[in-house]
Regions:
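Non-catalytic cap/lid and distal C-terminal segments of serine-dependent acyl enzymes
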Residues: 1-214
Length: 214
């Protein structure tokens, strides 16, 4: 089935190496490489442009087992089918498995046995600064975005919306891990992936406000 979006011009990135190409999973999406100064590398998103020049944006976050090749909303979550022909811009960040889309406080070296040579991930900065900058280049709104996700992405969507109310107006979570302060959650995260030890400082006491923040 042909869609309006697959015939629309490819978008761009003003950085030296950024680009968009036709998405090989969903023809109505583009696969865009955006340079992230915070992460010092190109990072990928799926992007579906609005069909009639709307500047509104919705962002959907993947779960803890997110892969580096695609965001599972685009195929398994039905985003390609659901948003086909719709007058809204859709951004699906690619990657970020077990990251909670947060800014890591520690480099992997010394805190992760399975990823000892990787640098600190800066997902929150990528989503709220680098992607927003890219959206502004495309003449999209940088306010009143909608953000949602499932599992890990659901809790992360709520946390990002709360901290960046200048960007996100609405947030939704499907089967999300919406708090990290419950007893046993830190241990559960560590058994999921040892990179969680690189994310945050120890949770601290219950009266420490930072205990309740992603």
């Amino acid at each position: 089935t042909h869609t309006t979006e697959e015939h629309m011009p490819l978008y761009h990135d003003d950085s030296a190496d950024g680009f968009c190409e036709r998405d090989h999973i969903a023809s109505n999406f583009q696969n865009c490489a955006i340079y992230s100064p915070a992460n010092k590398t190109l990072m990928r998103i799926h992007f579906k442009p609005a069909t009639h020049h709307s500047t509104k944006v919705v962002m959907l976050l993947d779960g803890a087992s997110a892969v580096d090749t695609h965001n599972r909303w685009v195929n398994l979550g039905g985003a390609a089918r659901t948003f086909a022909g719709k007058n809204i811009n859709v951004i699906l960040p690619i990657g970020g498995g077990a990251s909670f889309y947060t800014n890591f406080e520690y480099p992997y070296r010394g805190c992760s046995l399975t990823h000892p040579t990787l640098n600190m991930q800066q997902w929150e900065t990528f989503l709220t600064k680098d992607v927003v900058r890219w959206a502004q280049q495309q003449k999209l709104s940088t306010r009143q975005w909608r953000i949602g996700g499932f599992s890990m992405g659901g809790g992360s969507a709520l946390a990002l919306a709360e901290r960046h109310q200048n960007i996100f107006a609405k947030a939704f979570s499907f089967s999300g891990l919406n708090t990290i302060a419950l007893p046993g959650v830190q241990e559960m995260l560590t058994t999921t992936s040892d990179i969680t030890a690189c994310m945050w400082a120890p949770f601290g006491t219950p009266v420490n406000p930072s205990r309740y923040e992603f």
